[in-house]
């Protein structure tokens, strides 16, 4: 039986997920779509193969009798509202990051889900489904390079718009590292420090770019993450793990190497959707399969909360030159099953 999905938000990522669920994945059908811009919703349901009803409001999608599960891909500040509504309706919900705009908002979702008595929330952190990150985690978990001592990472975007601000380098960009590095190391953050090097001439008045974000984990691993969102040359994700007996690096995306005109070159991607397109497919297929099986296993509301707690500390650290403590409570047994 096909899982019937309702999608709230039909912008870039919402439309892409609707296409993915309709044309690529198995076992699900999009039956309801809403967007604050009705034209976006109508364009999404006009995609080949989509046969869905357009609703004026996200709550109408959640409450529709023929909708089994929800995808929240709307404007970030609405994520908490719609996720809580889905929990209240007893419907599994896949919420794109961020889960909420603050750690307090994420905690409200965690508390509501625990009160419901079963996992209903998966957060759209796709990197744990990426083949490269999975291979890197296996190296670490198998002890092939000994205990991880240091990590050097980078998250680089070609450019961002005038509405992108200094704090968004944390909440919209670094948020992926905040999740995937916890997962990669099976460790939590103890403290964070943010430094600003010389600023690129390609930024604007409301954005300090690049930023260097440095963490110490509870096990003592040191992590440096470069966040550079106007790097100009492409979309580039790097992760190097220095262990006791060796070094492991996140593999580069597959690309043709060219020798031409006295030069050796390899193309670099410019679109984040292309860099993790397979991971997006795998994470949503896993959500569909898990909902149908009655048990979610993907990134949880607690993972969303943990990332948000770290993000709040990072934003606080942007305003001081000193390290800031990351205070994450003990993970409830509910999320350790």
Swiss-Prot record:
InterPro entries reported for this sequence: Gfo-Idh-MocA_inositol_DH, Gfo/Idh/MocA-like_OxRdtase_C, Gfo/Idh/MocA-like_OxRdtase_N, MI/DCI_dehydrogenase, NAD(P)-bd_dom_sf
Single GO MF annotation: inositol 2-dehydrogenase (NAD+) activity
Class of the enzyme per the UniProt entry, highest EC level: oxidoreductase
HAMAP family: IolG (MF_01671)
Chain's role: Involved in the oxidation of myo-inositol (MI) to 2-keto-myo-inositol (2KMI or 2-inosose).
Self-association state and partner proteins as the record states: Homotetramer.
Listed name of the protein: Inositol 2-dehydrogenase
Origin organism lineage: Bacteria, Pseudomonadati, Pseudomonadota, Gammaproteobacteria, Enterobacterales
């Amino acid at each position: 039986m096909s899982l019937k999905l309702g999608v709230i938000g039909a912008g870039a990522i919402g439309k892409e997920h609707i296409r993915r669920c309709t044309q690529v994945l198995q076992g699900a059908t999009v039956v309801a779509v809403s967007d604050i811009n009705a034209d976006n919703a109508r364009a999404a349901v006009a995609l080949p193969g989509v046969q869905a009803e357009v609703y004026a409001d996200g709550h109408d999608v959640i409450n529709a009798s023929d909708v089994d599960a929800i995808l929240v891909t709307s404007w970030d500040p609405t994520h908490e509202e719609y996720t809580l509504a889905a929990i209240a309706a007893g419907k599994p919900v896949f919420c794109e990051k961020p889960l909420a705009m603050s750690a307090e908002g994420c905690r409200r979702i965690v508390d509501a889900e625990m009160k419901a008595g079963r996992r209903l929330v998966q957060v759209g952190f796709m990197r744990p489904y990426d083949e490269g990150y999975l291979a890197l985690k296996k190296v670490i978990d198998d002890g092939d390079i000994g205990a991880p001592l240091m990590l050097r990472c980078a998250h680089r975007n070609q450019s961002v718009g005038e509405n992108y601000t200094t704090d968004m380098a944390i909440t919209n960009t670094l948020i992926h590292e905040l999740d995937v590095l916890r997962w990669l190391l099976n460790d939590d953050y103890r403290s964070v420090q943010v430094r600003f090097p010389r600023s690129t001439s390609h930024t604007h008045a409301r954005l300090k770019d690049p930023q260097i974000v440095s963490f110490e984990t509870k096990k003592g691993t040191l992590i440096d993450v470069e966040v550079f969102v106007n790097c100009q040359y492409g979309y580039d994700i790097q992760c190097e793990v220095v262990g006791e007996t060796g070094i492991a690096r996140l593999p580069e995306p597959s690309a043709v190497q060219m020798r031409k005109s006295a030069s050796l070159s390899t193309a670099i991607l410019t679109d984040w959707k292309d860099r993790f397109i397979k991971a997006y497919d795998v994470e949503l297929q896993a959500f569909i399969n898990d909902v149908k099986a009655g048990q979610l296993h993907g990134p949880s509301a607690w993972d969303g909360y943990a990332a948000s707690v770290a993000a709040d500390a990072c934003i606080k650290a942007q305003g001081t030159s000193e390290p800031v403590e990351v205070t994450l409570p003990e993970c409830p047994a509910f999320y350790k099953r």
